[in-house]
Amino acid sequence: MTAPRTLYDKIWDDHVVHQSEDGTCLLYIDRHLVHEVTSPQAFEGLRMTGRKVRAPEKTIAVPDHNVPTTEGRDTKIDNEESRIQVEALDRNARDFGINYYPVSDIRQGIVHIVGPEQGWTLPGMTVVCGDSHTATHGAFGALAHGIGTSEVEHVLATQTLIQKKSKNMKVEITGSLRPGVTAKDITLSVIGLTGTAGGTGYVIEYCGQAIRELSMEGRMTVCNMAIEGGARAGLIAPDEKTFAYVMGRPHAPKGAAWEAALAYWKTLFTDKGAQFDKVVTIRGEDIAPVVTWGTSPEDVLPITATVPAPEDFTGGKVEAARRSLEYMGLTPGQKLTDIKIDTVFIGSCTNGRIEDLRAAAEILKGKKVAPGMRAMVVPGSGLVRAQAEEEGLAQIFIDAGFEWRLAGCSMCLAMNPDQLSPGERCASTSNRNFEGRQGRNGRTHLVSPGMAAAAAITGHLTDVRDLMMAPAEPA
């Protein structure tokens, strides 16, 4: 009789092509997602050796990191390096015959939003991309993680990847979330508890009632930030919500193929009695709306807290806290809700989906951004943008004083025109608050979409629960 297995064990076992004596495995890769930044050298390597892409039908490319989010980008990109990389992806997609969504295509967007949206991401698959936040696709019960440029070339050429198996970690969120608390608060709270190295060497399976109650968009938010907790990947077992989301997508199975796939997908769960190497349990009702105060995703506190002092920490974290406070321009004991905000960014592969825009618009409806506030919404794909316009969300953002942009990675990272100026402080729905991440000497506070919208209205970090159901301003 086979020993009980975790979800990770099952997907791994189904994809091992060969295993060496030292445990190193050759894994088959079902989907390879490609963008303009980490792929040029890989494609050039194929050209130099006369190789083709092994499985072009399983390779999907989209420009997202470097592309401007303003009109006219399909004809002109001002930054030379960005233009060269986007043009290279255009050429490589054409030359090697892979699936491609150029900036002129309404389906273009952030690769981790486009993949699920188009039905490329399916339960039980192995998914890789030359990008840290590939774990997003784990929300579907897929084994998904980032790879380096040399590995991108290896997958393009062979549709396989050399790997050693990680350990199993379970993160269980019991009970239900309270009003105003979101998937973003879950994932930040987990990282705040375990630290950015807590998941190192592990693949995390997220489970528990609070996870099951999340939408697919929420589950993608949770898995998206698994890497920020040090994990190789994050997984959530597929269920009826997963199947309903996938059904009818352009590249999802149809007819008899759907029924066969569904039968397999229903086996993708952790067996009773399966062993995890590490277990973390958090009560959902104990999670509050949170915000980061420092320069690491683990620097997270409830919005009702105060800025910590270096002396609140031990070991090497004392100096790290001192450096973070200096960089962020904060004072120990200062209320988080007293921190003034210059800019609000709603978007990214963490929170750029339609549900995220709905949550922010609900807070903003009938209100205006604070005087002097720079605020932008960047939908995660052209299709998300179109749906938001159809639902009237775009007009809510525009009426409130937000910029309504085209799809792309935008201000998540300083690789395109959407950047912070030195000293500028941003409430951001993205995933990293490192020094300079959003622009040289820019200051980033990671929050949920609702929290970002609340900060835009008040001009400072704000508990979104204070604005929920608040009356709109008179016209």
Curated annotation (Swiss-Prot):
Binds 1 [4Fe-4S] cluster per subunit. Signal peptide: none annotated. GO terms for molecular function: 3-isopropylmalate dehydratase activity; 4 iron, 4 sulfur cluster binding; metal ion binding. The keyword Isomerase does not apply. GO terms for biological process: L-leucine biosynthetic process. Gene3D superfamilies: Aconitase, domain 3. It catalyses: (2R,3S)-3-isopropylmalate = (2S)-2-isopropylmalate. It is an enzyme of class 4 (lyase). Keywords: 4Fe-4S, Amino-acid biosynthesis, Branched-chain amino acid biosynthesis, Iron, Iron-sulfur, Leucine biosynthesis, Lyase, Metal-binding. Pathway: Amino-acid biosynthesis; L-leucine biosynthesis; L-leucine from 3-methyl-2-oxobutanoate: step 2/4. Its cofactor is [4Fe-4S] cluster. SUPFAM superfamilies: Aconitase iron-sulfur domain. InterPro entries: 3-IsopropMal_deHydase_lsu, Acnase/IPM_dHydase_lsu_aba_1/3, Acoase/IPM_deHydtase_lsu_aba, Aconitase_4Fe-4S_BS, Aconitase_4Fe-4S_dom, IPM_dehydratase_rel_enz, IPMI_cat. Catalyzes the isomerization between 2-isopropylmalate and 3-isopropylmalate, via the formation of 2-isopropylmaleate. HAMAP family: LeuC_type1 (MF_01026). Belongs to the aconitase/IPM isomerase family. LeuC type 1 subfamily. Heterodimer of LeuC and LeuD. This is 3-isopropylmalate dehydratase large subunit. It comes from Cereibacter sphaeroides (strain ATCC 17029 / ATH 2.4.9).
